[in-house]
Design a protein with these regions (language model features):
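Extended helical scaffolds that flank P-loop GTPase cores
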Residues: 111, 138-141, 145-225
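Conserved C-terminal guanine-recognition region of P-loop GTPase G domains, centered on the G4
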Residues: 17-25, 45-115
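Switch II (G3) loop of P-loop NTPases
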Residues: 2-4, 24-41, 64
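Alpha-helix N-cap/helix-start motif
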Residues: 5, 39, 70, 96-99, ...
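Canonical P-loop GTPase G-domain recognition
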Residues: 92-153
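Solvent-exposed alpha-helical segments within well-ordered globular domains of core cellular machineries
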Residues: 17, 28, 44-48, 71-79, ...
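Conserved nucleotide-binding/hydrolysis micro-motifs of P-loop NTPases
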Residues: 9, 32-34, 64-68, 90-95, ...
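Switch I (effector-binding) loop of TRAFAC-class P-loop GTPase G-domains
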Residues: 1-22
Length: 225
């Protein structure tokens, strides 16, 4: 069963439904996006929904034939501290083209269930639903990938971004809690220059100055801006 409406303030469809044989589970089909950066209505709608509605779980459906592009969003979603399952869609096409994806290794690396599916052929859907309900019911959170396994040297660019995010996290900890934002997600978005997150955190001028210095130091080490 499905109900179609609109998200407030935008002309983006909102589709809500329940899963057959799992009437207790309501599913909201969010717009397809490639990142949680607020550059389009679809990205804003998706991000705002996850941050404000606090869903019990996320089913992250990616195109298995273009997995590198899609995993960027997956990594961002993992920062939201919400149970998640990764669905590798179009696996039938991957196999037909002679490709393979090492699902077990990907699952181990990400710390979330990874389920190969084909939506067009209705393959793997039951398994996907069972995994999604399980992680939501038992609040099984994604693993955390630490990108600073090396680089204790302050001049080492490999760990500069991580150190900056860690430092910003300490700075905004109370603000993130007050705003109901996952700490690492908020810190990461601040380092990326996300003005909407900065506004939501309501930093004081001194904290804004400290944030600017932390980002400038990171950019000096990495050569990025």
């Amino acid at each position: 069963n499905q109900h179609v409406g609109n998200f407030p303030g935008v002309t983006v469809d909102r589709k809500d439904g329940v899963i057959r044989n799992h009437k207790e589970a309501t599913v909201t089909d969010l717009p397809g996006i490639y990142s949680l950066s607020p550059y389009s209505n679809e990205e804003i709608v998706t991000r705002d929904f996850i941050l404000s509605e606090h869903p019990s779980g996320i089913i992250n459906i990616v195109d298995a034939s273009n997995i590198e592009r899609n995993l960027y969003l997956t990594m961002q979603l993992m920062e939201l501290d919400t149970p998640m399952v990764l669905a590798l869609n179009m696996m039938d096409e991957v196999r037909a083209n002679g490709g393979t994806i090492m699902v077990n290794q990907l699952e181990e690396m990400l710390g979330i269930p990874v389920v190969p599916i084909s939506a067009a052929k209705n393959e793997g859907i039951d398994e996907l639903i069972e995994h999604a309900i399980h992680v939501a019911r038992y609040r099984e959170l994604p693993g955390r990938i630490d990108f600073c396994t090396a680089g204790s040297d302050p001049a080492d660019p490999r760990g500069a971004v991580h150190r900056c995010i860690h430092s910003v996290g300490h700075l905004i900890e109370d603000h993130a809690a007050a705003a109901g934002l996952p700490l690492r997600f908020a810190a990461t978005k601040l380092v990326e220059g996300d003005t909407l997150i900065e506004k939501a955190l309501q930093l004081n001028p001194n904290e804004t100055d400290i944030l600017g210095h932390a980002i400038a130091e990171m950019e000096t080490v990495t050569g990025l801006d």
